[in-house]
Amino acid sequence: MKYFLWSAVTIFAIVNVVGAKNSDFDPRCLRACTAIYRPVCGFDGKQYRIFASECVMAFENCNLLLKSQKAFQKTLMSFCQVEEDFDSDFCPEVCPLLYKPVCGSYGDIKKIFPNECELKRANCKFGEAWEKINMDICRNISFKSELIDPKKKCLKPCNLNWDPICAFDGEKYFTFGNRCDMEIQTCLRSEKNWTLIRKGEC
């Protein structure tokens, strides 16, 4: 999960040829994109989706158009938060930088998520089973008990560099955008910490 605090930073671009290792994409769409994480929100008329950058969205749109499918149009990042009326099969790769807390229940554990997208991502990406419940329930629980407030305990500034690392939780491997992102996700999880396996994608 990525909670980046926007700041004015100078980052040197690293060129990455998008699609070069993926045989599912048409070679006519290969392009050099910087490996800097600057997310944009796209909408294809049915679903919202977050792309790592405008360049990556353009690359995927190229492949969609060659297959006579509808391309994504750039829209406001705030639209990419997962709402209840979204497609239930949609699993966000990254969530918007929005603090609109929701209360989640996982068995006897209650936990505050920064937004509904993060709750959904915990379920579909990490195999958890959080259920959204009334926010008052989380507010009424003492923070000294099992309640976790990620805004206070887990969120911290992360840079926008795409410096992927491969992590393992004992069951599955997962690629995080950088080490800071992995540390936040480990903090937010109620079970099974992520362990760094190596630098680079899994």
UniProtKB/Swiss-Prot annotation:
Expressed by the venom gland. InterPro entries: Kazal_dom, Kazal_dom_sf, Prot_Inhib_GrowthFact_Antg. It comes from Dolopus genitalis (Giant Australian assassin fly). Pfam families: Kazal_1 (PF00050), Kazal_2 (PF07648). May act as a serine protease inhibitor, since it possess the kazal serine protease inhibitor signature. The recombinant peptide does not produce toxic effects on insects. Disulfide bonds join C29-C62, C33-C55, C91-C124, C95-C117, C103-C138, C154-C187, C158-C180, C166-C202. Residues 1-20 form the signal peptide. The keyword Signal applies. The keyword Isomerase does not apply. GO terms for cellular component: extracellular region. Its main location: secreted. It is found in: Secreted. Residues 21-87, 142-202 form a propeptide. Glycans are attached at N140, N193. Residues 23-77, 85-140, 148-202 form the Kazal-like domain. Keywords: Disulfide bond, Glycoprotein, Protease inhibitor, Repeat, Secreted, Serine protease inhibitor, Signal. One of its GO terms (molecular function) is serine-type endopeptidase inhibitor activity. The record marks A35, I36, L97, L98, L160, N161 as: Reactive bond. This is U-Kazal-Dg21.2. The peptide presented here consists of a single Kazal domain but is suggested to be derived from a multidomain Kazal protein after proteolytic cleavage. SMART domains: KAZAL.
